[in-house]
Amino acid sequence: MMCKALVFAVLLLAVPLERADSRALRTPVDAIQFVEQFLEHYNDLLNIDDLENQTGDQLESPQPLSSGLKVAEYPKWVDVPSQNDNTWFRLLRGALANRKRALPDRAKRGWNRGCFGLKLDRIGSLSGLGC
């Protein structure tokens, strides 16, 4: 994903714009220097492969709890905090946990329409002639 963003940034900077007041880099040398500086600055970011390797390592080797808290103090659906969690890993895991849950079936079906549809059901309930 980061590679796609880098390719897009390089293509965006390399294509000269027709407008005179644009901020596009004028020469390919400037564009190459900019991309090199960009890569040097963001080279140390965590990528997807590192995240997968880190999650695989944590699943393979269980670590003892050093925080003094017992496992019984936590419900089964809550992860026990470990001290060596990477900040990126915690951030991504929290983002996945905070996703909206699936919509209930009622939201997918719409209003309860009853026997004869919504309008006729309201008329029937007022007059006592429901189904």
Curated annotation (Swiss-Prot):
Regions that span the bilayer: none
Pfam families: ANP
Tissue: Highly expressed in brain and liver, and moderately in gut, gills and heart. Expressed to a low level in atrium, ventricle and liver of fresh water eels.
Xref: SMART domains: NAT_PEP
BP term (GO), one: blood vessel diameter maintenance
Keywords assigned: Cleavage on pair of basic residues, Disulfide bond, Hormone, Secreted, Signal, Vasoactive
Main location: secreted
Residue ranges listed under propeptide: 21-109
Signal peptide (residue range): 1-20
Disulfide bond positions: C115-C131
InterPro entries, per the entry: C_natriurtcpep (IPR002406), Natr_peptide (IPR000663), Natr_peptide_CS (IPR030480)
Subcellular location: Secreted
Coiled-coil stretches: none
Entry annotated with the keyword Signal: yes
Alphabetized PANTHER family for the sequence: C-TYPE NATRIURETIC PEPTIDE, NATRIURETIC PEPTIDE C-LIKE PROTEIN
Function: Hormone which plays a role in endochondral ossification through regulation of cartilaginous growth plate chondrocytes proliferation and differentiation. May also be vasoactive and natriuretic. May be important for freshwater adaptation.
Family statement drawn from the similarity comment of this UniProt entry: Belongs to the natriuretic peptide family.
Name used for this protein in its record: C-type natriuretic peptide
